[in-house]
């Protein structure tokens, strides 16, 4: 830090050209930086979709075999089609 006894105009002679310059009593501290925002993933909600077709589902229960198949098809407002098939 600068020595408080030395006038600032000695260190910076061009400041003496200003008539109304006065040395501030102390520096204003810099504000604390904000934490960066965490990126959030946008969830696709049901009302974001134009149509949802979940009619094609099948359940088979045999004595030696059990399976579940779920087929979902959705079309977005932009016309993109998404198909999800889940087989268990």
Curated annotation (Swiss-Prot):
Additional remarks: The major E4 form is first synthesized as an E1^E4 fusion protein from spliced E1^E4 transcripts, such that the first few amino acids of the E4 protein are derived from the N terminus of E1.
Function: Contributes to multiple aspects of the viral life cycle including viral genome amplification, suppression of suprabasal cell differentiation and egress of newly formed virions. Induces host cell cycle arrest at the G2 phase by associating with and preventing the nuclear entry of host CDK1/cyclin B1 complexes. Inhibits cellular DNA replication by preventing loading of host replication licensing proteins MCM2 and MCM7 onto chromatin. Within the cytoplasm, associates with host kinase SRPK1, a splicing factor regulator, and inhibits its activity.
Principal subcellular localisation of the protein: host cell
PTM annotation: Phosphorylated by host ERK. The phosphorylation triggers a structural change that enhances keratin binding and protein stability.
GO annotation terms (biological process): symbiont-mediated arrest of host cell cycle during G2/M transition
Name of the protein described by the UniProt record: Protein E4
Disulfide bonds: none
Cellular location(s): Host cytoplasm; Host nucleus
Any Pfam family the entry gives: Pap_E4
Family: Belongs to the papillomaviridae E4 protein family.
Assembly with partners or alone: Assembles into oligomeric complexes. Interacts with host CDK1. Interacts with host SRPK1; this interaction may favor expression of late viral transcripts. Interacts with host cytokeratin components KRT8 and KRT18.
Keyword Phosphoprotein part of the UniProt annotation: yes
Keyword list, A-Z: Early protein, Host cytoplasm, Host G2/M cell cycle arrest by virus, Host nucleus, Host-virus interaction, Modulation of host cell cycle by virus, Phosphoprotein
Cellular component GO terms, alphabetical: host cell cytoplasm; host cell nucleus
UniProt superkingdom: Viruses
